[in-house]
Amino acid sequence: MLDFPAHYSSTPSTQCLPPMRHPSLVSLSHDHHHGLALALRCRKQALGQLKPMGAAGLRERAKEFADFYRLNLIAHFRAEEEILFPLMRAAVPGSAALLDELLGQHEQLRQAVPQLDAGSGLAKLIFDLGDLLERHIRKEEREIFPLFEAHIDAPQAEMIGVELKKILGEGGGVSVNDKGLD
């Protein structure tokens, strides 16, 4: 079990806050936050609940998703696939099926991004991508990260944090909105 810094508290407050993450996972969680917001925009856009509506809005959202993939998900997936998942597979008994499912979702997302350039079926594709991205992120946040925090000791966690930062950069990924690409 990890020892968290003294200032780190998972004690519930009066507000409903997301779970605190071990510092080594914060950059991945930061990407997840932006990914969840994008997933919601994708689903709303596909359902005609965001302006601009119609084909123009769908093209805008497709570009946003492709930009997010390029700026965030490529490095994010690499960090998970090269650093986090191999450690989890070795250290957490019974995690193989869950990790294989997540790797399969990475591949689904990779294969779907080039389809965003196609004109037909864009609403369904954007909705499906938003849905898949949300389910994927929630599974990592609710299942993988708690397993990491329960099974990985402090020295391993620190080492993982350093390795993740090498791939993701000091601040983790950036929001597409942060780059003015929305």
Indicate residue ranges for each PLM-predicted region.
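Small-residue-biased structural context
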Residues: L2-D182
